Amino acid sequence: MATTDHPGVIAPPPLIYLGFLLAGWGLAELGARPEALEAGFGWLAADFGLEMPIRRGAALTLIVGGLVLDGMAAGLFRRRGTAVEPWKPSTVLIIEGPYRFSRNPIYLGFAVTYAGLGIAMDSWVALILLAPCLLVVDRFVIQREERYLAAKFGGAYDAYRQAVRRWL
């Protein structure tokens, strides 16, 4: 039986975030339909009540911040010559840069970007769905990656795991 040199995550993490974001958008759109309003589901389309400049500023700040964090973290993988994709083998344990503060800065960046997009869409539902999205990422991506990294890098990963928090 062949062994695989990757964590075996359930799906590419960006697709998990995108799936939940699109579900939030879709539910908000359905909630705005007249038949949904009549049936009492209009709350799905409720907005934040923020004025456009405030909403745009908050959304832009979060989106840019999340993308910058993602770029910094992913750039370390490329500079160190290892794959950023979790379905490919890891050849180096990255513990510098944003990885000094979070073991998962890319997923943290995705979450911040997602929050910005939810605000840009003016959708409470999209923001509420960030919580189950993070649960799926935590249980079916991060925990699998952690088992893989512990097996691959042994004591070095265990020491890193004890020194740096999973998210923040």
Please report, for each region that a protein language model flagged, where it lies by residue:
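Extended, alpha-helix-rich binding/interface surfaces that flank or overlap catalytic cores
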Residues: 104
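Membrane-anchoring alpha-helices and their flanking helix-loop junctions
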Residues: 1-96, 108-168
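Solvent-exposed interhelical
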Residues: 99
